[in-house]
């Protein structure tokens, strides 16, 4: 027997008690979950405390609760249309009597107006009737938009703090951070069908300056958010422990020249600013322009991916249901987003079984390791798709990685605890399955560096540098510590494993 073999065997024997203990604590926690499935208060508390990893599908402007938005509107001296609940610019009517255009501040003393605004700006108290969930949901953004656009730091602070309170450690916020600068630049450049020439024209017109200014502005907002949360002080809020990155959010419902300019800006930002880890295309997939221009948008993504091959891409696709659009528009968006849009992740993916050759697509997504960002509450409220009608179990059956996501938790009146709770109650997931989804959220994050995991297909097998260490241990080996120091993604994953160990000790 060689000396190396003896050393390896000794290492196994040294680690075996810890590995058995970790396995036993996981099994014990799983048994506890099984014992409380029919006790909602205990189940809710368990899921709330569960370490959830990351939220990869979170629109910053939709993450803010209406109560915060009312405060923002009051700070800005805005008015509200009493009939529609839409914010308006001043001057406002007095609060002393019933008026059509009261100041937002009037709502503090008028509970009817306050509750009306909260209901109009969210899905609270919405009931199916004349207005669909889809229409009520998306109409909310225009109603509160004047307040959300001017309070970016406050929005970041509020959303990040809720993430921390919800036992998340990482968030990728979708945010159109340039304030319309790319759209203005597009207006100065004549449209060219040749994407290379269009890119050259936009760069010549100052796109790199727009990217630099956008990054500078967001850095200031990010720093201000940390001040609001009192990070670095004894009174630091829970959000201070959350790692935040951004996805540049392209508004695909705008004219094609603006969409191209925004996509280009997204690629430029993700290539030059560490805060921006990728880009996404947003706005309702069923609206006219996103449907009509879908193939052109994929062509734009295909071209610019060739120019910026290292930039990460996640795309909304399949946020559709039968009856919302003609049947033919249900048949290709997810596949096109993966194959031509080069998406590493798909947001929603609800209409996957309406795609041409859906089983073939599922196998392709599993082979390409494309993760689906699952937003259960959002899909129920907007599309009316839930329970057995939702494809989440089908994705899992075919080995497609998934992670739960909040989407627009402020508008939905939800949070990540509710997403996990809905998943447990609806699909009866085991504790091991919940851990897997949380781990996948960080595995498929766009953080730089190598993964802690060498394999995630069946079991999570550690990278060689950390193979001899208990995941999440406070004192990893020198080689593992060096690996973690060099790879941010692995560091976040190691942190999650430590949180799991702490969580499981309670059971």
Region roles according to the model:
Residues 4, 18-20, 313:
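Intrinsic low-complexity/disordered segments
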Residues 8-18:
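Bacterial N-terminal signal peptides
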Residues 23-507:
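Metal-cofactor-binding active-site regions of metalloenzymes
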């Amino acid at each position: 027997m060689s000396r190396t073999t003896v050393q390896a065997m000794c290492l196994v024997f040294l680690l075996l008690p810890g590995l058995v203990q970790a396995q036993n604590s996981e099994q014990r926690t799983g048994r506890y979950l099984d014992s409380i499935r029919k006790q909602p208060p205990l189940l809710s508390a368990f899921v709330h405390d569960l370490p959830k990893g990351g939220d990869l599908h979170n629109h910053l402007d939709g993450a803010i609760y209406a109560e915060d938005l009312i405060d923002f509107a009051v700070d800005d001296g805005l008015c509200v249309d009493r009939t529609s609940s839409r914010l308006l610019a001043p001057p406002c009517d007095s609060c002393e009597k019933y008026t059509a255009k009261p100041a937002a501040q009037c709502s503090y003393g008028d509970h009817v107006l306050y509750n009306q605004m909260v209901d109009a700006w969210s899905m609270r108290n919405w009931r199916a009737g004349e207005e669909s969930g889809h229409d009520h949901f998306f109409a909310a953004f225009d109603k509160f938009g004047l307040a959300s656009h001017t309070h970016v730091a406050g929005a970041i602070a509020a959303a990040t703090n809720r993430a921390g309170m919800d036992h998340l450690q990482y968030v990728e916020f979708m945010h159109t951070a340039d304030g319309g600068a790319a759209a203005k630049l597009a207006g100065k450049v004549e449209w060219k069908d040749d994407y290379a020439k269009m890119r050259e024209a936009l760069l010549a017109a100052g796109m790199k300056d727009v990217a630099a200014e956008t990054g500078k502005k967001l850095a200031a907002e990010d720093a201000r958010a940390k001040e609001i949360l009192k990070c670095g002080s004894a009174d630091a809020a829970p959000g201070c422990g959350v790692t935040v990155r951004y996805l540049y959010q392209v508004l695909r419902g705008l004219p094609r020249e603006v969409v191209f300019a925004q996509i280009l800006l997204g690629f430029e930002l993700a290539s030059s600013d560490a805060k921006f880890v990728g880009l996404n295309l947003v706005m309702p997939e069923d609206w006219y322009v996103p449907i009509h221009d879908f193939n052109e948008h994929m062509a734009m993504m295909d071209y610019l991916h060739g120019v910026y091959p290292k930039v990460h891409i996640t795309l909304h696709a399949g946020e559709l249901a039968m009856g919302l659009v003609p049947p033919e528009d249900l048949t290709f968006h997810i596949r096109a987003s993966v194959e031509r849009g080069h998406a590493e992740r798909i947001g929603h993916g609800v209409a996957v079984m309406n795609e041409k050759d859906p089983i073939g697509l599922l196998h392709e997504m599993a082979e390409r390791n494309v993760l689906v960002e699952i937003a259960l509450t959002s899909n129920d409220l907007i599309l009316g798709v839930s329970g057995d009608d939702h494809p989440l179990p089908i994705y899992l059956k075919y080995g497609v990685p998934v992670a739960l996501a909040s989407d627009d938790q402020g508008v939905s009146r939800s949070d990540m605890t509710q997403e996990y709770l809905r998943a447990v109650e609806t699909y009866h997931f085991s504790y091991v399955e919940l851990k897997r989804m949380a781990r996948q959220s960080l595995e498929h994050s766009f953080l730089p560096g190598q993964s802690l995991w060498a394999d995630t297909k069946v079991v999570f097998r550690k990278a060689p540098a950390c193979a001899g260490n208990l995941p999440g241990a406070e004192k990893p080996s020198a080689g593992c510590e060096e690996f973690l120091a060099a790879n941010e993604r692995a560091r976040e994953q190691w942190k999650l494993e430590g949180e799991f160990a702490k969580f499981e000790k309670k059971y």
